[in-house]
């Protein structure tokens, strides 16, 4: 009943039916105000985090993480979520930083990189054999083959992201690195050699010194329902409220999308937003420290759901 006053309770109680009974590992980090539940032998983790100013909890949220492989074990060590996962016949050790937002600036070395890339299982290209380059262009099919040190996951697309090569960092050539450009990378197998690689449309051998490849994080956040609230008073759940426009301020963030679903519908539709005028330096990762998005809604507050999504290889900070 949309006219009934909502029952407002602690968020940790509201998710009891959302958490599966197969969760078998728990890890905590008091200094990060975080609890992590792990469903081993699946790809899912459930993270609860809150912020307390010393008097009360000002922010609390549950999030569900899906990793590319099957989780064998996951623990919080210092400020990292350290995960051992399995895919195909291989095991991967990975670390996800909790308190350092990626700036978008990444510099590639010959075999690694510096900076935080918002991709999972991210790696520089690696030669499959001493006689084969790590990045090869197939002129006949107009594709670039990118070889990696692990076996790509079957039927799962990855992301190729351009960064700044070490030799170009801080020089005029940095502008030619096209930092922040990305393209879909499709897993493939060579029939003649059985080498596994990622395929990207177009020629990228000129950017080989700055290429990194990994799997993207698909972000999806459904925003809570809006209610009328008088200054200094609680929300009035019975008041009639029409939402004309929603303005959403985000922290260090790249591109994001917004989707709206009418109440009772199963279809999410894109909402075309507007942003305040601003600039960022050309040929750099399109990440700014703060951005404000304005969304035209023109709906009763009980007539729609609104969510934020992103499948781009850039950081997103909604807090």
Model regions: which residues?
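Beta-sheet repeat architectures centered on beta-propellers
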Residues: 1-319
């Amino acid at each position: 009943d949309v006219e009934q006053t909502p029952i407002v309770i602690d968020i940790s109680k509201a998710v009891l039916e959302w958490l599966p009974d197969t969760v078998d590992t728990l890890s905590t980090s008091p200094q990060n105000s975080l609890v992590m539940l792990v469903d081993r032998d699946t790809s899912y983790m459930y993270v609860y985090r809150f912020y307390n100013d010393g008097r009360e909890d000002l922010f609390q949220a549950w999030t569900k993480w899906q990793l590319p492989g099957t989780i064998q074990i996951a623990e919080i060590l210092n400020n990292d979520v350290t995960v051992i996962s399995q895919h195909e016949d291989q095991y991967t050790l990975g670390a996800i930083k909790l308190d350092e937002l990626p700036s978008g600036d990444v510099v590639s070395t010959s075999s690694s990189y510096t900076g935080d890339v918002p991709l999972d299982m991210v790696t520089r290209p690696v030669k499959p054999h001493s006689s084969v380059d790590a990045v090869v262009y197939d002129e006949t099919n107009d594709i670039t083959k990118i070889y990696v040190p692990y076996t790509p996951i079957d039927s799962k697309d990855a992301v190729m992201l351009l960064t700044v090569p070490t030799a170009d960092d801080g020089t005029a050539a940095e502008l030619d690195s096209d930092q922040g450009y990305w393209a879909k990378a499709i897993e493939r197998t060579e029939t003649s050699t059985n080498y596994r690689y990622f395929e990207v449309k177009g020629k990228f051998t000129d950017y080989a010194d700055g290429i990194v490849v990994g799997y993207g994080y698909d972000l999806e956040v459904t925003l809570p329902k809006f209610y009328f609230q008088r200054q200094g008073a609680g929300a009035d759940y019975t008041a009639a409220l029409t939402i004309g426009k929603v303005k959403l301020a985000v922290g260090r963030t790249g591109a994001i999308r917004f989707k709206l679903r009418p109440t009772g519908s199963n279809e999410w539709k894109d909402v075309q937003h507007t942003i305040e005028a601003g600039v960022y330096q050309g040929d750099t990762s399109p990440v700014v420290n703060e951005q404000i998005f304005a969304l035209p809604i023109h709906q009763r507050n009980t007539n729609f759901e609104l969510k934020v999504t992103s499948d781009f290889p850039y950081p997103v900070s909604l807090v």
